[in-house]
Amino acid sequence: SKFPALPDPEACSVPMVALGGISPATIDLCRQAGFYGVATLGYIWEKPEEALSRYIRLKTPFVLSIAGFDPSSGAGVTADLKTFETTGSYGLGVCSAITFQHEDSYTGTHWTTPEEIQRQCELLFQKHNPEFVKIGLVENFEVLDQLINYLIQKFPRLKIIWDPILKASAGHIFHENNTLQLNRILPRLFLITPNTEELYQLFGDSAELTRLQKIARTYRLNILWK
């Protein structure tokens, strides 16, 4: 870093804004350092149109999808990136698996190892600090647990969304529920987005509205029932 004494923004309970000496050469540096924003004084009056353009780019949220690659783009990381773009976010993608399928047929999965997933993330994190991460298809709950630990260590305030892909749309079941690991995973998530079948797979007979409300309160978890 070019900062002589850079504070740790993640260790602060309130957003930190960089002030003083802000120019086009230092805006990206401030963002990479983890500052919530920058305050420009003299520079913005010298080139207002250029300053506005840079501000818009600075405030565009980065959203990361860690998901499988579906060649038909009906689901997985490519579908997520298309969705992110429609919201005005800048989508980043990490491949957790390659699936061999189209809309009606599934023939297999090649899993990306946890080390390969983290290697993809490490390079992205050198340049981008995502505000949200959406996790889709992963090999099992153990890999999911490891991945969440890794992400929280990198960005303690990161909001993690889990789309529990337990079965492919073509019918293949990827993995079964593990209650003990699920109890460790849920408290660290911001949101889960299961459909009805996935709700029953995750919570069994507890998948009814009042029970789900209790689960959400217990784990401080948001549940979007699709």
Residue locations for each model-derived region?
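Structural motif
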Residues: 32-34, 87, 218
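Hydrophobic faces of well-ordered beta-strands that scaffold small-molecule active sites
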Residues: 16-20, 38-40, 91-93, 160-162, ...
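Short beta-strand/loop segments at the ligand-binding rim of alpha/beta enzyme cores
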Residues: 10-19, 61, 157-160
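Glycine-rich beta-to-alpha transition loops that act as phosphate-gripper elements at the mouths
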Residues: 14-25, 76
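Glycine-rich phosphate-binding active-site loops on the catalytic face of alpha/beta enzymes
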Residues: 1-5, 27-58, 92-100
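Conserved phosphate/ATP/ADP-binding segment of small-molecule kinases
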Residues: 173-226
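Short, glycine-rich nucleotide/cofactor-binding loops
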Residues: 66-74
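Conserved N-terminal subdomain of the carbohydrate kinase-like
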Residues: 60-65, 81-169
